[in-house]
Amino acid sequence: MFRRGIEVETEVLEFRYMEATEDLMEKFGDNCQKVIKLSRLRYAKDSFDKGPIVLTTSYLPEGDSFLFDYDFTKASLTTALKEHQKNRYSMEKEMTALVLGGRESHLMGMKEGSLAMLITSITKNDKGQVIDVTESIYPLERNKFVWKLKL
């Protein structure tokens, strides 16, 4: 967000180990039994009353326990990974329209059934190993999406 000129305030909702789902095992590899789950609500600075601009949930390998040394209300996940030589080399993003269910609409301060954009990112290192899987839910009425492509 900062790179796009948006200052944000972050609220950490969940930061813990959890059993990997089948979907996460498929992405991280069959040896992945547990992952670290980091869920955050992000608000535009000084706009707390307007509601969050994104609900982001990141899943990282169980071995990345160094992450628990960080305060993610202030620290950047990207910076924490770089500081531990977890350099992002490639990223795949999938964008899907989403109708907010009860939990998400409550967290986002929106009506159930409101529209959002779900962006799922899979980040890999230069060896093709998955560094993180992140699901970000952006309510459409609070966000604008612009793609600039060179042809």
Describe these PLM feature segments.
Residues 1-6:
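Short linear motifs at protein or domain termini
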Residues 9-151:
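C-terminal all-alpha effector/ligand-binding and dimerization domain
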